[in-house]
């Protein structure tokens, strides 16, 4: 019985009809309402956390691009240790620069000295194989960042899809119980089935109240993730192009 209080608080703040419907629900209906309520808590937690993360990522991405484009050499921020870790672009940049350093070090150059001496061009030149290696590192990192941004989005998609069906299940179950009681009592009076039907319909209402915010939040977050994914792809191409211009082959 105590577990029912998980759903009592929000329902008690609603009008008397919703509270009455919950009270007259079957145990299965109450259980479904409680499950939906708990799912709603997790859904809102994921949406709020994810939205804050996306806002910070967008802001840090803007700052990172401004700082990167102000420098004369593509590896300047890497050398200066100017980190923008909240931006999904920064890991791409960091690992690409690290790969560049590995390639140049394999040619007998000290990466730090080489970068500092290459602000206005480099005496070292990179061939297509070396550029492709750096590009592959950048693209793999971009894929990893895309997966990180999409983490927990599956839960929101599941909530959007499953909540209405779970509510519908509760409604069908409740209506079935209501008609069973009508047969048991041997009466077709509306007063005999109305309480059970009211409780049954409550699960659909709660299911929709969970699904609608989930759907809106999912679409908003998907739009931001799509925008950042495009930013990552564009930056990856820009970075490789800048590296080619500074270390172009003879």
Positions of PLM-derived features:
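Predominantly long cytosolic amphipathic alpha-helical stalk/bundle segments
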Residues: 59-165, 175-189, 214-250
């Amino acid at each position: 019985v105590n577990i029912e209080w998980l759903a009592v608080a929000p329902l008690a703040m609603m009008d008397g009809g919703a509270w009455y419907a919950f009270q007259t629900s079957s145990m299965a209906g109450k259980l479904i309402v409680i499950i939906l309520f708990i799912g709603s808590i997790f859904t809102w937690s994921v949406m709020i956390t994810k939205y804050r993360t996306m806002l910070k990522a967008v802001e840090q991405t803007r700052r990172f691009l401004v700082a990167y484009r102000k420098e004369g050499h593509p590896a300047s921020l890497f050398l200066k240790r100017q980190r923008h870790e909240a931006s999904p672009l920064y890991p791409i940049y960091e690992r690409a620069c690290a790969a560049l350093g590995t390639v140049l070090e394999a040619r007998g150059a000290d990466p730090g000295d080489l970068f500092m001496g290459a602000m206005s061009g480099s005496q070292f030149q990179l061939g297509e194989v070396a550029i492709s290696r750096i590009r592959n590192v950048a693209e793999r990192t971009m894929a990893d960042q895309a997966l990180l941004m999409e983490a927990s989005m599956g839960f929101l998609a599941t909530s959007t899809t499953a909540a209405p069906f779970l509510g519908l299940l509760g409604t069908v179950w409740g209506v079935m119980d209501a008609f069973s009681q009508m047969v048991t009592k041997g009466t077709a009076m509306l007063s005999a089935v109305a309480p059970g039907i009211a409780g049954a319909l409550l699960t659909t209402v709660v299911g929709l109240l969970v699904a609608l915010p989930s759907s809106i939040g999912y679409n908003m977050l998907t739009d931001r993730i799509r925008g950042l994914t495009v930013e990552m792809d564009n930056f990856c191409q820009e970075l490789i192009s800048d590296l080619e211009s500074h270390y172009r082959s003879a």
